[in-house]
Amino acid sequence: MINNENESLIAAECHAQADEKKAMLEVENLTKKFGDLLVLDDISTKIYEGEKVVIVGPSGGGKSTFLRCLNVLEDPTAGRILFMGNDLADLKVNINVQRQNIGMVFQQFNLFNNYTVKKNITLAPVGIGISNMRKQKIKNAFVPIYNKFYKKYGDKINAKIDAEKEQLIKQSEELKAVLKDVSAEWEKTKKSEERQGKTYATYDPELTKKKLKLTAKIEKKERAVSHKNHIAEKQVVAPEFSSKKEIKAHAEENAMRLLKRIGLEQKADAYPSTLSGGQKQRIAIARALAMNPKVMLFDEPTSALDPEMVGEVLDLIKELAEEGMTMVIVTHEMGFAKEVGTRILFMSEGKITEENNPKDFFEHPQNDRTKEFLRKVLNA
């Protein structure tokens, strides 16, 4: 993914500095294909707590697809995405629960035109709050029954779990040894192909299938290992809210606080069709913030705005950045990327071909494709 020794050292230095913080998102060998078209090509990277990672690059390079995979709006063909240690591809992981901690802001706002601004912001918190309250009450009802079962059979079950885990780890290591050889042969078949004016990487289809099958088998074994955890006694946990009325009141109070923050408190009862593009995007950001996310994903948040409205949206994102929010931002605004980003990723042909801190990325690019891109966009 990184093309030469200097770039590899720079990437390693970026990750070494970030490793002092907690990894929020871990991307391992992420591949995405649409039919025979390879859009994301074996991407691996980490997003750390508090980072503002800005992704730039030519159109068709896979930036938006990568962002959509992070929130599982697109299913990866192969590879893993871990969010706070949870594998998002694992069927046993509740994706909707994980998404509550990953805010997403789209190019086209995606507001509900038949709801007021306030209801757009409160819709998800109220719905999820009621669902969580009900689920917790049901769980609490079964705690005494479960604990009786644990006292009788817990030790035997945990011993069986340990034996199964050891066997799965052994099988996974054997598959990794085979994958290493197949990957080496697969890389030798790489070719560049022009489609509709864009360059894509292609590989031998049979080796690609073999590589993906092996990767999927390894992922399945590793997911199974991650679930081989000892059982233990459970405790009754009180729900955060005790009634629907309490949930709705809390959500509306939070919505008004967010609207006041973005200067649109007076628009609480207005409908999206009456708002400007800049106002809609600020409300879309407030809606994402209403879930108190750990990470915010921005997919070209200003691309659908008139030029005079871009500034108000970028200013709001800058405020969030200054407060320490972890962010991943796809943008064509190079000045904004330089000012806000703590790390810049350059994507081309489905790969991260360069990454660095903003100053060195813009002043001392290493990759030829990066240099060409910056010449075009900065001199435009």
What are these regions (language model features)?
Residues 79-90, 134, 138:
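Conserved ABC transporter NBD signature motif
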Residues 296-299:
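Catalytic Walker B motif of ABC-type/P-loop ATPase nucleotide-binding domains
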Residues 71:
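Helix-to-loop junction immediately C-terminal to a conserved catalytic motif
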